Regions:
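Short aromatic-hydrophobic micro-motifs that form the base-stacking/packing surface
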Residues: 4-6
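Conserved core of the sugar-phosphate nucleotidyltransferase
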Residues: 2, 11-99
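Alpha-helix initiation/capping motif
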Residues: 72, 106-107
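Catalytic donor-sugar/metal-binding loop of nucleotide-sugar-dependent glycosyltransferases
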Residues: 86-105, 111-126
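Basic/polar N-terminal segments that are highly enriched at the extreme N-terminus
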Residues: 52, 127-128
Length: 128
């Protein structure tokens, strides 16, 4: 009836997150549950950069807004996903999210990402 896809690059994943995601899935009208993480800084104050290295505000209307006054934004944690199989296969997609802590998430695409995952792991689990 349901499936969980756990990504191999999620070494900080906790069983509790999977359980919370499952409970959210079965007790909601969502077809999928995605763990999400809050961006550490409001993306509405983000910059873009052109090929000459010149930077510009992606949203210039927020250039003078204090960061603490801007709405939070979230990104996929890249750890796991829950799906109701029949709705997923039929394309009837309605996603719900569960928020997970930034210190337990690390996207791993580069060697530097792996080093950050090791640092977070030591911070969370190594006593000494």
């Amino acid at each position: 009836d349901n499936m969980c896809c756990i990504l191999a690059t999620s070494p900080l994943l906790l069983n509790e997150d999977i359980v919370v995601g499952y409970e959210r899935l079965i007790h909601s009208d969502f077809s999928s549950i995605v763990p999400i993480v809050q961006f550490s800084y409001p993306i509405l104050r983000s910059y873009g950069m052109n090929s000459e290295g010149e930077i510009y505000f992606n949203w210039p209307e927020y250039a003078k807004t204090r960061s603490q006054d801007l709405e939070s934004a979230y990104h996929d944690s890249g750890t796991f996903y829950w799906h109701k199989i029949d709705r997923w296969l039929s394309g009837d997609i309605k996603r719900g999210g569960i928020v997970v802590d930034e210190d337990r998430v690390q996207d791993i695409d580069t060697e530097q990402d792996w080093k950050m995952a090791e640092i977070k792991y030591k911070m969370l689990y190594v006593r000494g």
